[in-house]
Amino acid sequence: MWVGVISLFPEMFRSVTDFGVTGQAVKKGLLSIETWNPRDFTHDKHRTVDDRPYGGGPGMLMMVQPLRDAIHTAKKASPGKTKVIYLSPQGRKLDQKGVEELATNENLLLICGRYEGVDERIIQSEVDEEWSIGDFVMTGGEIPAMTLIDSVSRFIPGVLGDFASAEEDSFANGLLDCPHYTRPEVLDDKEVPSVLMSGNHKDIRQWRLKQSLGRTWLRRPELLENLALTDEQEQLLAEFISEHNAK
C-alpha cells in the first residue's frame, strides 16, 4: 500500500515509518509512506502557509495555493488511482468497518489540516472523503492520520505475523476482544482461567467467545444492538449475564 501525506509537520510521521509494526511494514516494502509539506510550495521569504478567513472571525485557514500545489504534486507521485482523504471533525467517524473499507484501497492520500481548517473549495475539488477519529477537536490532522495509517496497515497481507490477529481483535466481529493471559500462571494470587490450559480447543473457543460477548455487554452494550447473534452466541451471552448477576 502507498500512503501520501500532506502535512506542515512531516517529521511527526517518523513515528509511523521508523517504529513498531508500521515501521517493519515499511522496511519490508509492504507499506510506502511519502510526505509533502505545503511550506515547500510557498513563494515568499517567510514561507507563509496561513491566511485570513473571509467574513472575519478568530483564527486562520491554511493558504490555498501552497496546499493545492502540494496536493497536485502528491497525486502525480502516486503509483495509481488514489483516494484523497481529509482528516476533519466533520468527517465520517472511523470505526472497524471503515478501517476495513479503507484497507481495500491500494493508494491513499491523507491531508492534515491545521489552524481552523482549509478552504471549503479545496475539499469540494480535491477531496474524495472526510474522516474523523472522534467527536473532539485536535490541533491538527497529523495524529488522526497516523491513527488511520496504523489501523489500516494491519490489514495489508504480511504486515502482521498472524493475520488472524487482525481478524480476532476488538471490533473485528463487532464485539470487544476477550481477556488474554500469559506467564506466570499465578500473578498476585490471580490464576489464569483453567480452561485456557486445558488443551481443549472447543472449550477454549467457547470461553473466549463468551467472554467477548460478556465484555461487550458490560462495557459497550450498544454494539450488541446492531448484531444478529447466532443461537450459540445468544446462549453464551445469557450464561455470562446469569453468572455475572449471581456474583
From Swiss-Prot:
EC number: 2.1.1.228
Residue sites binding S-adenosyl-L-methionine per the record: 113, 133-138
This protein's UniProt keywords: Cytoplasm, Methyltransferase, S-adenosyl-L-methionine, Transferase, tRNA processing
Record-level GO cellular component terms: cytosol
Highest taxon listed in the record's lineage: Bacteria
Name of the top EC class for this enzyme: transferase
GO MF annotations, alphabetized: tRNA (guanine(37)-N1)-methyltransferase activity
Pfam families: tRNA_m1G_MT
SUPFAM superfamilies referenced in this protein's UniProt entry, alphabetically: alpha/beta knot
Entries under InterPro entries matching the protein: Alpha/beta_knot_MTases, tRNA_m1G_MeTrfase_C_sf, tRNA_m1G_MeTrfase_TrmD, tRNA_m1G_MTases_N, tRNA_MeTrfase_TRMD/TRM10
Catalytic activity entry: guanosine(37) in tRNA + S-adenosyl-L-methionine = N(1)-methylguanosine(37) in tRNA + S-adenosyl-L-homocysteine + H(+)
A GO BP entry: tRNA N1-guanine methylation
Function per UniProt: Specifically methylates guanosine-37 in various tRNAs.
Family, per entry: Belongs to the RNA methyltransferase TrmD family.
Protein name: tRNA (guanine-N(1)-)-methyltransferase
Species of the source: Vibrio parahaemolyticus serotype O3:K6 (strain RIMD 2210633)
